[in-house]
A protein has these predicted regions:
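Metal-dependent phosphodiesterase/phospholipase catalytic core, i.e.
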Residues: 1-108, 115-116, 130-143, 152-162, ...
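C-terminal active-site rim and adjoining tail of enzyme catalytic domains
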Residues: 111-112, 119-245
């Protein structure tokens, strides 16, 4: 995968049309997780958190490692870097989240959901209406009645929902259950404003510049910037992560 450059969107693609303001960073390769951890540690910012998504599908098991292999490799990398308290593992495939909760309870998990026409990972399949969705690790939406209650039943503390699925009712229900609520992927100013007005606990966005601008307009505290091109003073540098076996 490191043969591919990630620093520039293919100009003729529809994706490029969605992000005309993207600033290219040529000769950018896909980093390993270890390399990403080391990069942020070199910047000296101890507040940066890592939101790591496991990418696998119960509908295409041959395409990736098993949930067990993937989750355990991720747990190992996080622990070796000493960053367990600064990492959250999120996934649409809740099997990996269940493994992380059992085997690394110090690492937070976030339950990704969507109930859209183009993606629905919580509703039963039309071919098996009484069975749980293959994505939800055996937890059945029909038995629990709502997505917030489904996430809560799975042991989740963070519900990360598609922004269009969130409204005042289910946000209030989630908060009453003790869940934090994140919205993804929020890129338009009107969407950002609506969700901040609604009272979500966090936003996932491809446009952090727009999110920060709206937060600043509202007088909300902004996360500290993390330049990574200048090394911090020697006494603030974190040691590099140990080599992986």
């Amino acid at each position: 995968m490191q043969r591919y450059q990630l620093g520039r969107i293919r100009p003729s693609s529809r994706y490029a049309a969605q992000f005309p303001d993207q600033v290219p960073v040529d000769i950018t390769r896909l980093p390993t997780l270890d390399a990403l951890f080391a990069l942020v540690q070199r910047a000296g910012n101890r507040q940066v958190r890592f939101d790591i998504e496991t990418k696998l599908s119960p509908l295409a098991p041959a395409d990736t490692a098993t949930p067990e292999v993937l989750a355990r490799a991720l747990i190992s990398a996080i622990r070796e870097a000493g960053l367990a308290t600064r990492c959250t593992v999120q996934s649409f495939d809740w099997r990996t989240l269940q493994i992380v909760q059992r085997e690394a309870p110090e690492i937070r998990t976030a339950y990704l959901t969507a109930q859209q026409r183009w993606l629905d990972n919580v509703s039963p399949l039309a071919t098996a209406p009484d069975a749980p969705s293959p994505w939800t690790a055996g937890f059945n939406l029909r038995q629990h009645g709502s997505v917030p209650r489904l996430v809560h039943a799975a042991g989740g503390r963070i519900w990360s929902a598609h922004f269009a699925d969130l409204d005042a009712r289910n946000l209030q229900e989630a908060h009453a259950l003790g869940l934090q609520v994140l919205a993804w992927t929020v890129n338009e100013p009107t969407q950002i404003q609506r969700l901040l007005d609604l009272g979500v606990d966090g936003l996932i966005s491809d446009r952090p510049d727009l999110v920060r601008a709206e937060m600043a307009r509202r007088g909300l505290p902004l996360p500290r910037a993390t330049p990574v091109d200048a090394a911090p003073p020697a006494d603030t540098q974190a040691p590099p992560a140990p080599p992986r076996p």
